[in-house]
Amino acid sequence: MLRMKLTIPRSLRLFAGALLISLTTVSTQAQDWAKARLEASPRHHEYVALHHGSRTVQAFVVYPEVKGKVPVVVLIHEIFGLTDWAKEMADELAAKGYIVVAPDLLSGFGPNGGGSSEFAGQDAAVEAVSALDPDGVLADLDAAADYAKKIPAGDGKIASIGFCWGGGKSFAFAAHRKDLSAAFVFYGPGPADVTPIAAPVYGFYAGNDARIGATVPGTIAAMKAAGKTYDWVTYDGAGHGFMRAGEDPGNTESGNVAARDRAMTRLLTLLGELKSAPQASNSGVNPIVGGKKAAPAACHPAGNSAAM
């Protein structure tokens, strides 16, 4: 038998090694800016184990530095899992005066029974999130909301907020959970059946997001037909994921930055109204189905749908 020995030149081996290190660095450091902000936060962070049935879900919890009781926000992560950005977003909301509970919905599904942080890369996390059982996700979110209701520093109001995949889950959770005070949906689709929804739903969408944008007219029609409160804004010039991309120092799209700033202002205004209002509900109130498109530099509503 003829055997051949392949000798790889040292220069090529060094190049391949450098390339591997570079790719690994890009993957692992993609959210280093979010991690740095999180580590610099003065707020109290903790992980809690949420139990339901035979399952345990780890949740990241952040407390604001305020006096008095405040609403609790259940934050639902993107399709990438509970990343440093998701936790940094939770901390940002806490900085504005809200308790935030962010469950890791990949708890127990990672390598060695771990969660989001145990996956080797983004693709593996995306695949795992995509494979999650929808009913199991709702059960995990129920555990998070049940915990939120019992937090002594909470005022009894809970709201859900989700991004990307989590945006769709926030909408679905509103159709599942009757005691939500509000649901905030960032670039996520609506559920197949909106009739059980009992809380007002607020949508935040990107103008340059054809996949999700194509679902919005159907959602508007369904919410209107069911007599539900649904208030939405589409931010022209922004792409899917603008809340994360808009604060990423490496982002080069000005539309994402503008959309994030304005969406954050809107979100905080709505949360502020929630804080000062009695328990919100879609039951027994006059339904409102309206929205607008927000141009990159100005926002001028014109009825239920405003073109810029």
Question: Each predicted region: which residue ranges?
Answer:
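Short beta-strand/loop motif that positions the catalytic acidic residue
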Residues: G203-Y205
